[in-house]
Structures are given as structure tokens and as C-alpha cells.
Curated annotation (Swiss-Prot):
It holds the Pfam family Ribosomal_L27A. Disulfide bonds: none annotated. It comes from Chlorobium phaeobacteroides (strain BS1). InterPro entries: Ribosomal_uL15, Ribosomal_uL15/eL18, Ribosomal_uL15/eL18_sf, Ribosomal_uL15_bac-type, Ribosomal_uL15_CS. One of its GO terms (biological process) is translation. Belongs to the universal ribosomal protein uL15 family. This is Large ribosomal subunit protein uL15. One of its GO terms (cellular component) is cytosolic large ribosomal subunit. Keywords: Ribonucleoprotein, Ribosomal protein, RNA-binding, rRNA-binding. Residues 1-52 are annotated as: Disordered. Part of the 50S ribosomal subunit. The keyword Ligase does not apply. One of its GO terms (molecular function) is structural constituent of ribosome.
Amino acid sequence: MDLSSLRPAKGAVKNKKRIGRGPGSGNGTTAGKGNKGQQSRSGYTRPVSEGGQMPIYRRLPKFGFTKPNRKNVIPVNLSQIALWMENGKATSEITVENLKSLCSARRADYFKILGNGELKSPVTITAHFVSKSAQEKILQAGGTITLAERTLLEAERIKDTPVEEGLMKPKARLRKKKKIKS
């Protein structure tokens, strides 16, 4: 016995059903679609109908909601920052622009520094949020933290100010005046 003499077991491989190839084939003329009507024509698909039964899209409840003004916060661990510094992708000063390019994020994203990992050298980090453990580890390594108030997109939209200054500019808090009924 050799490889050239191997064959599949009898009945294991069926021939492909060739539809619409003459009446002698058994699947000619109407090609298994019955006689005339919309269902026999090309392009027909059965509608999502379950007869008299309540359809699934009405049996299942609606749920969930996506906030239109949600903040997309990207987590960045200290271990990632240490790795970037080892590989030469980041210097001892990490800004929001650096984080955007390193994390392949959008300009409208926020960044949160998390405390997973250790820092070997002092780092100056600018981010939107910092966890307590990350803050302790950065300060322990001799680094500094600066919290940004705005996203890159918001900072770029401020006229006559560089992006670095725009990031630090606090947002104006709008307070509604209460109407006093008299």
C-alpha cells in the first residue's frame, strides 16, 4: 500500500448536486423550487416571519443606552511606560501627545495612569487621571505628575494658545441661576 492507492471509503464522498441541468438529472426544469410564483424567482428571500407566533425581535426586550457625551478613557499602566522607556519609544517626559501616538488613540480620548508595574527612573507624566497607587509609585521614583484638564481635540480648538497650554486650561463651569418665585 502506498499514498497513490489511498481512496476515501465507499459512500463517504457524495457528488455535488448540479441543479437546473436538464430533466434527466432529477433536479432540472424547476431546479427544486416548485412551480412558478415569487418563491421560484431569483432574488427571493423568505421574510423574517414566524407565522402567527410572536417574532423574536418583539419577544426580547430593548435594553442599553450609549451616552452621547461619554468619556473614552484609555488605561495606561506603569509597566507599559517602563517598557516604552526601555525600548526608546518614550523619554523621561511623557505628554498627552506622546500617549496618543503610543496607544494609537483618538484626539478626543482621555488617559488614566494605573499603578500596575514599577518605574526604575524618574518620569514627568501629563495625563487626565492618575490612580492613587500610580501616583505613589511615580513620586517614589522621583517623578512628577501634571493633570490635564482638556483632551487634545478641545485644546486644539482654543484660539491663540498652543496645545500644551490649552490642555492645562480649566473648563468653564456653567452654573444655572435659580429662579425665585415671588
